[in-house]
Swiss-Prot record:
Classification via Pfam families: CTP_transf_like
The organism of origin for this protein: Thermobifida fusca (strain YX)
Cofactor(s), names only, from the UniProt record: Mg(2+)
Function of the protein: Reversibly transfers an adenylyl group from ATP to 4'-phosphopantetheine, yielding dephospho-CoA (dPCoA) and pyrophosphate.
Amino-acid positions noted as binding substrate in the UniProt annotation, renumbered to this chain: S9, K41, L73, R87
Keyword flag Transmembrane: no
Keywords assigned by UniProt, alphabetized: ATP-binding, Coenzyme A biosynthesis, Cytoplasm, Magnesium, Nucleotide-binding, Nucleotidyltransferase, Transferase
Record-given protein name: Phosphopantetheine adenylyltransferase
Length: 164
């Protein structure tokens, strides 16, 4: 069985992420979407909130599961019998960074990284851009799944209320 992992911080998950997950699911028997838990980096959403949004966004795919991990991705891959890592490339600058990570992951574990080029309509899209637009009440409906849009609006309303 070919099992692959799509790792990321997904803060929040975007339509670009979903496009890569969809394409990976078509090409592989099983896809694990793995949310990196980085205790040194404070995101907008908690790991559990990210898992919830990802589960909702990927519920149409029978062969996709969602998990979280901390530590090295290759250790997660070994523990879950993953044969390859799937990463998206939006630009040449993505390639430079991703190639270094892929080579290190291979050196550490022998696990290959498969690169999928981003759909051109999502090549500009990033979670940080979505957060910035949503923070100022901009329209993110074309950038994220509907449930994620709702969660973004609720999160920023909660933060505004908290910060007075």
């Amino acid at each position: 069985m070919r099992r692959v992992v799509c790792p990321g911080s997904f803060d929040p998950v975007t339509n670009g992420h979903i496009d890569i997950i969809r394409r990976a699911a078509k090409q592989n028997e099983e896809v694990i979407v793995a949310v990196l838990v980085n205790v040194n980096k404070r995101g907008l959403f908690t790991a559990d909130e990210k898992l919830e949004m990802l589960r909702e966004a990927t519920k149409e795919f029978d062969n996709v599961t969602v998990a979280k991990f901390d530590g090295l991705l290759v250790d997660f891959c070994r523990a879950h019998d993953v044969s390859a890592i799937v990463r998206s490339l939006r630009s040449v600058s993505d390639f430079d960074y991703e190639l270094q990570i892929a080579q290190m992951n291979y050196q550490l574990s022998g696990i290959d990284t498969l690169f999928l080029t981003a759909n051109p309509k999502y090549s500009f899209l990033s979670s940080s851009l979505v957060r910035e637009i949503a923070q100022y009440n901009g329209d993110v409906s074309a950038l994220v799944p509907p449930y994620v849009e709702e969660r973004l609006r609720a999160k920023y309303a909660e933060l505004a209320k908290k910060n007075g």
